[in-house]
Regions:
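Mature N-terminal, pre-catalytic/accessory segment of carbohydrate-active enzymes
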Residues: 164-165, 172-241
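Sequence-structural signature of mature extracellular/luminal beta-sheet repeat domains
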Residues: 142-144, 235
């Protein structure tokens, strides 16, 4: 798929690949995948409770994906899901703010009609595209217990029993940076699944080790090899992202 990436840093939502923007690129995926990109600083609330019955109320568990690299603010809007009361501004709004310079993410108290949201809620905040391996959690300014773990390349922090009036602050280490792509691992995984001879796989693997991250050399060598356009393109995507 040919895409245009505006200026900035972009993250693939599903596989975690990190791209620098300001250019067009060809992105390669399997038949079961599509590229979905989030910009640095993106704040994306989600829930797994999507059945017909679930959507009649607001969820007591929310996952919030937060991407590293830039400041951003998001306001989560919720209403009663059934009536037209929202036309009279009968709603609940939860501000969420990422202060990347301070390495801090905040979920502020619910504004508006707090009765529209659960009396307590569990937030699972997933930090994507960051080098952080740990975090501290504060509820109303007091350090709180939270489950912190790495999950599928994300740093996941679960904060339970959050009341509508609570302020949740998650602080990452000061030295947290935007993560870097593991080019070798991604390229070797691609080769593992490529339908080519083992000799060709070995040649490409040796080239990757020999070039030691030198993009221009890798690109030139790949162009000179007798590879399919798709395989060459997929390798170049990983190398030049």
């Amino acid at each position: 798929t040919k895409v245009w990436l505006p200026e900035g840093t972009w993250f693939d939502f599903f596989n975690g690949m990190i791209y620098e923007g300001g250019r067009s690129m060809d992105l390669y995926r399997t038949l079961e995948e599509i590229p979905v990109l989030a910009k640095a600083g993106a704040i994306i609330p989600m829930t797994e409770k999507i059945s017909a019955l679930d959507v009649e109320s607001n969820p007591d568990e929310l996952t919030v994906r937060v991407y590293a690299g830039a400041d951003n603010t998001f306001i989560l809007y919720e209403d009663d899901n059934t009536s037209m009361a929202y036309e009279k501004n009968d709603c609940a709004k939860t501000p969420m703010t990422l202060e990347w310079g301070a390495r801090k993410f905040t979920i502020a108290p619910v504004e508006g009609n707090q009765s529209l949201v659960p009396e307590s809620r569990t937030y699972c905040v997933e930090f994507g595209g960051s080098s952080a391996k740990e975090a501290k959690v504060f509820v109303n300014g007091v350090e709180a217990d939270a489950e912190v773990k790495e999950k599928d390349g994300l740093l996941a922090i679960a904060v339970a029993d959050v009341k509508p009036q609570d302020t949740v602050t998650i602080c990452l280490p000061e030295d947290t940076e935007i993560a870097k792509n593991d080019v070798m691992t991604r390229a070797m995984d691609l080769l593992l699944h490529a339908e080519i001879s083992y000799i060709t796989k070995e040649q490409i693997a040796n080239l990757l080790h020999k070039a030691d991250g030198k993009v221009a050399i890798l690109a030139a060598e790949l162009q000179s090899m007798e590879l399919s356009n798709d395989l060459r393109g997929a390798l170049l995507e990983i190398i030049t992202a």
